[in-house]
Amino acid sequence: MTPTADDILSRAHVVVLPMAVRFRGITVREALLIDGPAGWGEFSPFVEYEPAEAAAWLASGIEAAFTGLPEASGWVEVNGTIPATDDVEAVLERFPGVSTFKLKVAESSQSLTDDLRHLTTLHTLRPNARIRVDANRAWSVDEAVEAAHAFAKVCDLEYIEQPCATAEELAEVRRRLASTVATPIAADESIRRAEDPFKVAQLGAADVAVCKVAPLGGVGRLCGVVDKLGLDVTVASALDTAVGMDAGLVAAKLTGSRAAGLATQRLFVEDVAAPRPVVDGRMEVTRTTPDPARLHELRAGEQRRDWWYQRVRDCLDFL
């Protein structure tokens, strides 16, 4: 049974977390956290998402807070995430012991020359690391093929994530690269923001599925999608707080994820709980209890709190 708005909001804390670096064009991360009977849950769809899409994020928060996450334990290998910045070395210092990195490319303010410079710097500083790049749907097919060939001259990539917008375009990029550099393709938005998340597998459009708990509606739903896709998987954060990271770690453990994109707490100046330690490039699957003092210090103003409360009400209509 879906909880009511009153059930959720009576347990809610709205927080604003300052970012250490600009990421996805934002400098603060807002989230509504739910202190539920089964644990803490998170509702933090990006502000531009309409209620129909954001509702999956609410379902994920409800799963964690009211139903409870599936049982999992142990350790998960993680990747470091490098924004589009010239100060690559400073960001690397946030990820001690990590041997896989995801580099953001194709940002609106950046050129392919910029991307190549950042990739070259990263590869020079971490020559033995596995490197994946993420274009967030920015390229045409021709641009993606050009970039893949340029990147291949710097180093072999683990994969290029979501180079183009549609599954059909990903399939064409993959076909054109197969006889040349053969760089693998990963799908993210073509799974989590698509009407048919299984189209990428049907078209042979990807080698790897990048799956995020909140946009897919929770750990249970993510595991179902992964099983049906039949692809290798990388579980990643949707820029989650420490609370949302719990679900990501559980999902990564249950699905046998490649190095998971779950070390993103290090992109925040402050979070509601201390960053999980990364030990030899891995993080432990544990549950987080936010620090009451941090919840108070990071609480949103009344206007933003009310905005998030209304967003919960709007999204409940789609569950």
Predicted regions located by residue number:
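Solvent-exposed, charged interface segments at domain starts and junctions
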Residues: 2-14, 176-209
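N-terminal capping/lid subdomain adjacent to the active-site entrance of alpha/beta enzymes
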Residues: 1-154, 179-180, 273-319
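Shared catalytic-loop signature of beta/alpha-barrel
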Residues: 60-61, 195-294, 303
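Active-site-adjacent beta->alpha loops and helix N-cap segments on the catalytic face
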Residues: 107-125, 139-143, 163-177, 194-196, ...
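Glycine-enriched alpha-helix->loop->beta-strand junction motifs that scaffold or abut catalytic
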Residues: 96-99, 126-128, 149-157, 174-185, ...
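Catalytic beta/alpha-barrel core
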Residues: 100-111, 130-137, 155-167, 182-193, ...
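Residue-level detector of flexible, active-site-proximal loop/helix-junction positions
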Residues: 21, 85, 192, 240, ...
